Amino acid sequence: MAQSKMPRRPAMLDAARADAIVGDEDPAATAAVAHTAAWALMGVGDETFTDADVARLRETVRTSGVDTIAHVWSRSPEFTLPGALWRVYLLHEWYHRDPLLVAERYADGSRAPIIQGLEAPVELRPLSLIMEEVDSLLRGDLTDDDLEYVLGEASRAMRVLAAGEAGALWIEDPADPLAHRVTMRHSALLVTADELDVAAREAAVGTLD
């Protein structure tokens, strides 16, 4: 792995406040908690969120699942780490809920003559391998050094999914548990792929907030 980059982000809250603030309506506080959880999942703490706090959060995620913290990312902008992780989380949840559907759409897209955003010839990896890497990221098994690669691979997968006959639509039913402004917007898969590409580039140079 490359030498770890020092991320640029808002000041983290202390561990007790991060645990207690779920559901807080204060946007600044919610954003701070989202950043705390996201960077801690990557193994990054600071003077107020110690290595022990980080280890405890990662262990909680590994034993109880990323759902325990993911919801605090749902309002985060796409150009931030929590925003990028939220988008990857939505892909993760979709894949694990509907594995056959997602696999079929990926296979369909892989046969498309043109995959928007990918230059021909396109060498595609099995979707299962990409999702294993996404799972590792969301379990806290990876670090911020892995962000560029995993976010980029998630973006490529979304471009392939959008290339088939079903197009770039993602979630259409507003009653779907995965219905969100990210998943229900026009050309949702492609727009999200673009956002993840930007986040990957920012991660590569250590400027992902």
Spell out what each predicted region is:
Residues 1-85, 89-93:
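N-terminal domain-start signal
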Residues 71, 87, 96-209:
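A contiguous, surface-oriented mixed alpha/beta subdomain in the mid-to-C-terminal portion of proteins
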